[in-house]
């Protein structure tokens, strides 16, 4: 482990990881988050337990593959489920079709092998996630607002028991956008009845100005 990863794992409070690209900032929150979610009490509770918010769809997609590799390959599928809920995800596509698309992607083949099956815990369509919300939800702030506003999406957070909230590339939230995201998070907490101090909030950045 890098020093910043070890320090993050020891934290039991909110923290920000500001370190260079390729230095393992994603693992800084993933390792303690997964360890926490695998505790017997949290594991037995259905619903979304962690929300990972990215500013861009491309980042959300890239991180989905990294987290899937860690969960389903490196950790041998410990029983947590993963889903990405963005505008690029099909609403009700057949899982077989979505699996075929995923299996053709070079990043999937690189992570899992040429003939690997898609892990069952990797939820691929919005319908799958609405029917059985994932433990770890990847999204962006615009889609999170849709989830909270649109009745057809609200089942995604039904019964949610949020323990972790991660904002990646936190330095990108400035000015009016930062205010919008702050209010969105407050709205999320209010709608789910989240009490202060019950959620670990993490911010990550590879470009954070030291003066900030």
Feature names for model-found ranges:
Residues 1-18, 27-35:
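Conserved pre-motif I regulatory segment
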Residues 5, 17-23, 169-179, 185-211:
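Conserved helicase ATPase motor motifs in RecA-like P-loop NTPase domains
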Residues 12-17, 46-50, 133-135, 200:
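Pre-Walker A (Motif I) flank of P-loop NTPase domains
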Residues 25-37, 64, 181-185:
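Motif I (Walker A/P-loop) of helicase-class P-loop NTPases
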Residues 47-72, 83-94, 143-146, 177, ...:
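Conserved Walker A/P-loop ATP-binding site and its immediately adjacent core
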Residues 52-53, 136-140, 166, 199-205:
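Structural recognition of the conserved hydrophobic beta-strand(s) that form the central parallel beta-sheet
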Residues 75-149:
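Inter-Walker segment of RecA-like/P-loop motor cores
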Residues 134-145, 154-192:
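SF2 helicase catalytic motif II
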């Amino acid at each position: 482990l890098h020093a910043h990863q070890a320090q993050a794992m020891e934290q039991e409070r909110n923290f920000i990881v500001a370190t260079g690209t390729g230095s393992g900032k994603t693992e800084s929150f993933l390792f303690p988050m997964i360890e926490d979610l695998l505790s017997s009490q949290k594991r037995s509770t259905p619903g979304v337990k962690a929300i990972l918010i990215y500013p861009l769809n491309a980042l959300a997609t890239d991180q989905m593959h990294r987290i899937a590799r860690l969960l389903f390959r490196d950790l041998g599928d410990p029983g947590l489920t993963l889903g990405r809920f963005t505008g690029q995800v099909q609403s009700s596509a057949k899982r077989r079709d979505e699996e075929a698309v995923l299996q053709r992607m070079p990043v999937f083949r690189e992570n899992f092998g040429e003939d690997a099956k898609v892990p069952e815990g990797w939820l691929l369509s919005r319908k799958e996630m609405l029917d059985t919300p994932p433990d770890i939800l990847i999204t962006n702030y615009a889609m999170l607002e849709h989830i909270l506003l649109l009745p057809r999406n609200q089942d995604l957070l039904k019964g949610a028991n949020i323990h972790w909230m991660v904002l990646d590339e936190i330095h990108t939230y400035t000015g009016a956008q930062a205010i919008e995201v702050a209010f969105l998070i407050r709205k999320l907490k209010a709608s789910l009845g989240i009490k202060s101090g019950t959620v670990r909030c993490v911010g990550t950045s590879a470009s954070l100005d030291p003066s900030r």
